[in-house]
Amino acid sequence: MQAATVVINRRALRHNLQRLRELAPASKMVAVVKANAYGHGLLETARTLPDADAFGVARLEEALRLRAGGITKPVLLLEGFFDARDLPTISAQHFHTAVHNEEQLAALEEASLDEPVTVWMKLDTGMHRLGVRPEQAGAFYHRLTQCKNVRQPVNIVSHFARADEPKCGATEKQLAIFNTFCEGKPGQRSIAASGGILLWPQSHFDWVRPGIILYGVSPLEDRSTGADFGCQPVMSLTSSLIAVREHKAGEPVGYGGTWVSERDTRLGVVAMGYGDGYPRAAPSGTPVLVNGREVPIVGRVAMDMICVDLGPQAQDKAGDPVILWGEGLPVERIAEMTKVSAYELITRLTSRVAMKYVD
């Protein structure tokens, strides 16, 4: 009997990369594998994508794991380096790094390195989180061009704040700032992540940085799914029924008795709970698939178990397969039901969930 298991479909992952190349045919691909590849497994994901042009991570430790695992493609530190003492490692490993503040720039100017570092200057075009403000960017860029430790030319990167809101006007403003600053500069350019790839073809430039859409999940909050853009779900969260019980009309189930059956029925108990990372906030009615059939969660999600209403005529039995999200049940639907973003759902699964890779 299978307990909580994440099944990762390598074929779907490769399909999605190819689909994104079709959407941005003139751009190179930075496959973003931060946060353990959005919960899909850092090394296995990178090894599944030998055709990616580069990989993007948030921490130096992630980049080092890629190198130790045999990944030789360029690796971009999306948030840059956090300590000047890391620069020799970045140089020796040929990592690319974002540079977004005075402390990082000064560290580069003062370092003694055997080889220069490939730099992506981060321009704050409107996210207002990381990056050099436009009014300070000219002088900052000039110092990078004069720095002996920076491989020339300097590349330029930014990030959209509201790419998933095509009518708000913010993305057009960010693009205008980005284009104005990049004009006449020789380096590579990148501003589009998942939302930019899908909705803003004029933002694709030299490199795009697919994140959640690479894993077949829509970055938009408009009830779309990855399938709407030709992508396939890579992760399926699965488990099994561990019991099937007769349940009488008028009886509650679970902690607090929050759900009471209106009919005689059969309940299934699934080996899954918030101890595995499934959202405790999932309300009654949240769907799961049992033997490929959609049935509702009933009662509260517990640490280790979830109850589902199989229906009075159900023939399901202990040991039968359950899909909590993934193939046949998009995680975007679970996000909508639970009010927990799909980003959080797929990245917060706990260590007791087994990982299985299939082709």
From Swiss-Prot:
Record carries keyword Transmembrane: no
GO CC annotation, single: cytosol
Binding site for substrate: R129, M303
Signal peptide (from-to): none
Keyword annotations of the record: Cell shape, Cell wall biogenesis/degradation, Isomerase, Peptidoglycan synthesis, Pyridoxal phosphate
pH dependence: Optimum pH is 8-10.
List of residues that carry N6-(pyridoxal phosphate)lysine: K34
Family per similarity comment: Belongs to the alanine racemase family.
PANTHER family: ALANINE RACEMASE, ALANINE RACEMASE, BIOSYNTHETIC
HAMAP family per the UniProt record, alphabetical: Ala_racemase
Protein name: Alanine racemase, biosynthetic
